[in-house]
């Protein structure tokens, strides 16, 4: 369903965002 798609998109966005940060130190 649409909710499942949103969930997958959100997880993908978070994963891409984390990779974009390049492992910046989390404070």
From Swiss-Prot:
Record's GO cellular component terms: extracellular region
Top-level taxonomic group: Eukaryota
GO BP: any one term: defense response
Keywords, comma-separated and alphabetical: Amphibian defense peptide, Antimicrobial, Secreted
Chief localisation class: secreted
Subcellular location: Secreted
Expression across tissues: Expressed by the skin glands.
Residue ranges crossing the lipid bilayer per the database entry: none
Function as written in the Swiss-Prot or TrEMBL entry: Antimicrobial peptide.
Similarity field: Belongs to the gastrin/cholecystokinin family.
Protein name: Caerulein precursor fragment R5
């Amino acid at each position: 369903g649409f909710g499942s798609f949103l969930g997958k998109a959100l997880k993908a966005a978070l994963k891409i965002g984390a990779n974009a940060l390049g492992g910046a130190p989390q404070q």
